[in-house]
Amino acid sequence: MSKEEVLEFSGIVTELLPNAMFRVKLENDHEIIAHTAGRMRKNRIRVLAGDKIMVEMTPYDLTKGRIIYRYK
């Protein structure tokens, strides 16, 4: 998928789920399920409940996303 087709949103992690999945509340009050991007796993960036993050989503499935950045 090309980078132009990806939607990016800010959100807050509300719950940690099994298999490195997270429940995220987006800034537009939608809740999605997200997993960490491979680059974040490789650099061992921890994501905890309450963290402010950036999520990228495909326009084809707006219920799932990938966490690409954790704000400091």
UniProtKB/Swiss-Prot annotation:
Keyword Cytoplasm: yes
Role summary: One of the essential components for the initiation of protein synthesis. Stabilizes the binding of IF-2 and IF-3 on the 30S subunit to which N-formylmethionyl-tRNA(fMet) subsequently binds. Helps modulate mRNA selection, yielding the 30S pre-initiation complex (PIC). Upon addition of the 50S ribosomal subunit IF-1, IF-2 and IF-3 are released leaving the mature 70S translation initiation complex.
Domain S1-like: start-end pairs: 1-72
SUPFAM superfamilies: Nucleic acid-binding proteins
Family as reported in the entry's similarity comment: Belongs to the IF-1 family.
Localization: Cytoplasm
Protein name in UniProt: Translation initiation factor IF-1
Keyword terms of this UniProt record: Cytoplasm, Initiation factor, Protein biosynthesis, RNA-binding, rRNA-binding
rRNA-binding in keyword set: yes
GO annotation, cellular component aspect: cytosol
InterPro entries from the UniProt entry: NA-bd_OB-fold, RNA-binding_domain_S1_IF1, TIF_IF1
Subunit structure: Component of the 30S ribosomal translation pre-initiation complex which assembles on the 30S ribosome in the order IF-2 and IF-3, IF-1 and N-formylmethionyl-tRNA(fMet); mRNA recruitment can occur at any time during PIC assembly.
One family name in Pfam for this protein: eIF-1a
TM region(s), chain numbering: none
Primary localisation category: cytoplasm
GO molecular function: ribosome binding; rRNA binding; translation initiation factor activity
